[in-house]
Regions:
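A short beta-strand-loop-beta hairpin characteristic of the jelly-roll/cupin
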Residues: 1-11, 27
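Conserved metal-binding segment of the jelly-roll/cupin
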Residues: 10-24
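A hydrophobic/aromatic-rich effector-binding and dimerization subdomain
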Residues: 23-92
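Hydrophobic alpha-helical core bundles mediating ligand binding, dimerization, or RNAP-core interactions
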Residues: 40, 87-91, 105, 109-117, ...
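All-alpha amphipathic helical-bundle segments outside canonical DNA-binding/catalytic cores
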Residues: 77-81, 94-111, 129-130
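N-terminal positioning helix adjacent to the helix-turn-helix/winged-helix DNA-binding module
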Residues: 79-82, 131-139, 175
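Basic/polar phosphate-binding segments, predominantly the helix-turn-helix DNA-binding elements
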Residues: 114-122, 138-179
Length: 179
């Protein structure tokens, strides 16, 4: 699995945290098969309607990318059991739907982010990686906006203010395939 241009080899029990705005993809390794579960929710559901300390100190920095969390958790890592416990508890509540289950889910998400922010913050990505990531986001946005038309290499290079050869080299080096 690749998140923000960094590859993470996964194994049974792996947990990957992908925040809003992070570019991510899944690629099969050789002929191995993998089963996975996505748990998707809007981080905004945890935001208070009015500005509070949780919004300003934790959630806003997560949303704008200035606070980065560990992406990949595997069994045996510090805090893996706590992270997995929150996810499993929320999953079990979704499965059984007891009265007021929404409150339990929200509580588990707050607990999860408390564990992550207290123990699993990372330093920012390198400047070079950040620039490549921003270029990739521009490419993806351009493709999303113009997906109904045929997009040429020349058009894509112009959109990024790059020469065609530089665009092709960048895309191949970053994505591992031609445009």
């Amino acid at each position: 699995i690749t998140v923000d241009l960094e590859e993470y080899p996964v194994q049974e029990g792996s947990i990957l945290l992908i925040l809003p705005g992070q570019v991510h993809s899944i690629e099969q390794y050789l002929d191995y098969k993998m089963e996975y579960i996505n748990i998707i929710f809007k981080l905004e559901m945890l935001l208070a309607k009015q500005t509070d300390i949780c919004n300003s100190r934790y959630f806003t920095p997560l949303l704008d990318g200035t606070l980065r969390l560990t992406t990949h958790f595997t069994p045996g890592m510090p805090f893996y059991n706590e992270v997995a416990g929150c996810i499993n508890a929320a999953d079990e509540v979704c499965r059984t739907n007891p009265p007021a289950f929404q409150l339990v889910i929200k509580g588990q998400l707050f607990l999860l982010f408390s564990i992550l922010i207290s123990n699993c913050c990372e330093t920012s990505a390198s400047r070079k990686n950040q620039k490549s990531l921003e270029k990739m986001k521009r490419i993806i946005k351009y493709i999303e906006t113009n997906y109904a038309s045929k997009i040429s290499i020349e058009e894509m290079a112009d959109a990024l203010d790059l020469s065609q050869s530089h665009f092709m080299k960048f895309f191949k080096n970053t994505m591992g395939t031609t445009f």
